[in-house]
């Protein structure tokens, strides 16, 4: 049987991405469709989450599915030493699809290989976050009217930021120019720069973050420095406040510029930016509902024709 899991966005073709965005668009028109009546969605969060977990659960509820799962692994048998394989096999007895976030890179891939039901990767360590990428792509498409030939500036934690890794891979189909803005300690890992070269993705690296650097951006994708990924807290203290976006920095930017952030923010976007028409991060989070409805339907075999 075909495995319909969503482990990485790299497995999606250009056509598949555009198809998924069209599904999300239909759900934005009407999110209350009982397409998953009688289905059970399990949300297994081995790492903290607010937006991802709640938007997946809301997506499932609005589609008529029931939701089971946990948001704190300490309250489960994994705290007693149960293996990931056993947890996945056990939950597969109860659910039609498993949405999983895990602190280990590769955990979602492993789960998809042992589970008899589809796995949706809701983040695996610093590796991938494909459902976030789907809502990011939808947000970019909605605000720019296209995914083609855009200048996309990725700012902050590019080393541990799984959202920027996934976005980079997804955009390979659309001829972007990336600008990687990060301190030395958090720059884009070599493997992703090699990926860019292999797929003819243009990129420029910066360590400065100022008005001049960002003036040609179509998308400014801010990220927080992730304290939980650091083994050396002194290193975290050195870089945590390195880039802060302030409203005055936007004065000479393009009129079509939109600021995205996977959230939560800490202090990398000043609150005075919230009032700018270029700030889009809260609407971006709302788009997560529609993108995740599309993902749940797709992995469960529901097509665009079923919802038109």
UniProtKB/Swiss-Prot annotation:
InterPro entries: Asp/Orn_carbamoyltranf_P-bd, Asp/Orn_carbamoylTrfase, Asp/Orn_carbamoylTrfase_sf, Asp_carbamoyltransf, Asp_carbamoyltransf_Asp/Orn-bd
Source organism (scientific name): Bacteroides fragilis (strain ATCC 25285 / DSM 2151 / CCUG 4856 / JCM 11019 / LMG 10263 / NCTC 9343 / Onslow / VPI 2553 / EN-2)
Any one GO molecular-function label of the UniProt entry: amino acid binding
Summary of the function given for this chain in its UniProt record: Catalyzes the condensation of carbamoyl phosphate and aspartate to form carbamoyl aspartate and inorganic phosphate, the committed step in the de novo pyrimidine nucleotide biosynthesis pathway.
Listed EC numbers: 2.1.3.2
Oligomer and partners: Heterododecamer (2C3:3R2) of six catalytic PyrB chains organized as two trimers (C3), and six regulatory PyrI chains organized as three dimers (R2).
Reaction catalyzed: carbamoyl phosphate + L-aspartate = N-carbamoyl-L-aspartate + phosphate + H(+)
Family membership: Belongs to the aspartate/ornithine carbamoyltransferase superfamily. ATCase family.
Top-level division of the source organism's lineage: Bacteria
Involved pathway(s): Pyrimidine metabolism; UMP biosynthesis via de novo pathway; (S)-dihydroorotate from bicarbonate: step 2/3
Keyword Transferase: yes
Keyword line: Pyrimidine biosynthesis, Transferase
Pfam families, A to Z: OTCace, OTCace_N
Protein's UniProt name: Aspartate carbamoyltransferase catalytic subunit
Positions of L-aspartate binding: 80, 162, 224
List of residues binding carbamoyl phosphate: 51-52, 101, 129, 132, 263-264
Keyword Lyase included in the entry's annotation: no
């Amino acid at each position: 049987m075909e495995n319909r899991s969503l482990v990485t966005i790299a497995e999606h073709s250009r056509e598949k991405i555009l198809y998924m965005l069209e599904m999300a668009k239909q759900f934005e028109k009407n999110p209350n469709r009982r397409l998953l009546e009688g289905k059970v969605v399990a949300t297994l969060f081995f790492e903290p989450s607010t937006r991802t977990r709640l938007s997946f659960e809301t997506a499932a509820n609005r589609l008529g599915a029931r939701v089971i799962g946990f948001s704190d692994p300490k309250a489960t048998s994994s705290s007693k030493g149960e293996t990931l394989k056993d947890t996945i096999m056990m939950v597969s007895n109860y659910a039609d699809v498993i949405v999983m976030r895990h602190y280990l890179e590769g955990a979602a891939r492993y789960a998809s290989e042992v589970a008899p039901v589809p796995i949706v990767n809701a983040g695996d360590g610093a590796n991938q976050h494909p459902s976030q990428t789907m809502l990011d792509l939808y947000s970019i498409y909605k605000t720019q009217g296209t995914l083609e030939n855009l200048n996309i500036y990725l700012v902050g934690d590019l080393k541990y930021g799984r959202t920027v890794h996934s976005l980079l891979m997804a955009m390979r189909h659309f001829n972007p120019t990336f600008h990687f803005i990060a301190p030395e300690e958090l720059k884009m890992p070599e493997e992703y720069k090699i990926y860019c070269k292999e797929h003819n993705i243009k990129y420029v690296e910066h360590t400065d973050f100022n008005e001049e650097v960002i003036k040609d951006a179509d998308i400014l994708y801010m990220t927080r420095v992730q304290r939980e990924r650091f083994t050396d807290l002194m290193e975290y203290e050195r870089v945590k406040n390195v880039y802060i976006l302030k409203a005055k920095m936007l004065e000479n930017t393009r009129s079509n510029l939109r600021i995205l952030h996977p959230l939560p923010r800490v202090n990398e976007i000043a609150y005075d930016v919230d009032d700018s028409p270029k700030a889009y991060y809260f609407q971006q989070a709302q788009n997560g509902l529609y993108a995740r409805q599309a993902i749940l339907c797709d992995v469960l075999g529901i097509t665009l024709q079923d919802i038109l």
